[in-house]
Amino acid sequence: MELKDYYAIMGVKPTDDLKTIKTAYRRLARKYHPDVSKEPDAEARFKEVAEAWEVLSDEQRRAEYDQMWQHRNDPQFSRQFQHGDGQSFNAEDFDDIFSSIFGQHARQSRQRPATRGHDIEIEVAVFLEETLTEHKRTISYNLPVYNAFGMIEQEIPKTLNVKIPAGVGNGQRIRLKGQGTPGENGGPNGDLWLVIHIAPHPLFDIVGQDLEIVVPVSPWEAALGAKVTVPTLKESILLTIPPGSQAGQRLRVKGKGLVSKKQTGDLYAVLKIVMPPKPDENTAALWQQLADAQSSFDPRKDWGKA
């Protein structure tokens, strides 16, 4: 295994402290990250920087590396190397030096399997009106950069222009292939998953593919019938209130619900009878006339009966 000048790779001095080396690592990892850098050798440089950081960030590995680097030009280096305790070992133990510094993959770096990058999941808020048609959205997220120990060392901001298809539902997951973290040793990148969150609407409630809206009506509109303006996700419509309508009655408006690939839902107008404010003397007299005219009507006739 080639003994590389890790200090030169990191752009630091052998006398620099860990804080200085860590700062250099973060700067270089960001500079050569495959999702940021446009340089053709960015991926190779990124891995080289990560390899250097793996050694120089560990006090024991760094000390062993420094001793090896100091004796790299010694003719006896490949045959006999002096440990700090005066013990020596022969050339057949040479690979063990690298193993102690670089870990198990020192002698088997070429045999390491390709590893797929990590997936990233972010939540995307979508308004009900936006679900009717495909629309473009600019999303921003942080791409984690992992060090040689599998820990997140830093996060790189990333922005993508994406298309949100029509008919998306709450909790639906949209996959953007290869937009996760980079793979290792030639492995594929992870994916970015957009998790759709339908933002609550002030007027509409979602019931499957259908929508519900509460429509306030006056007592006389419910009794005599009326035409009232009701909003939908696209435009306002004129809704017919049949005579004798009751509070809580649901009136169906076909095709005004949510859109999906298979079908379009309906809109249900739920009637809410709203009483006028406390009546004045003249209005009270009119209500009394109505009560007298409907004296045989008992709204509680079947109340409590099975």
Swiss-Prot record:
Keywords associated with the record: Chaperone, Cytoplasm, DNA-binding
Single biological process term from Gene Ontology: chaperone cofactor-dependent protein refolding
Localisation per UniProt entry: Cytoplasm, Nucleoid
GO terms, molecular function: bent DNA binding; unfolded protein binding
Keyword Cytoplasm belongs to the record: yes
Cellular component terms (Gene Ontology): cytoplasm; nucleoid
Domain (J) ranges: 5-69
Top-level taxonomic group: Bacteria
Protein purpose: DNA-binding protein that preferentially recognizes a curved DNA sequence. It is probably a functional analog of DnaJ; displays overlapping activities with DnaJ, but functions under different conditions, probably acting as a molecular chaperone in an adaptive response to environmental stresses other than heat shock. Lacks autonomous chaperone activity; binds native substrates and targets them for recognition by DnaK. Its activity is inhibited by the binding of CbpM.
Name the record gives this protein: Curved DNA-binding protein
Name of the coding gene: cbpA
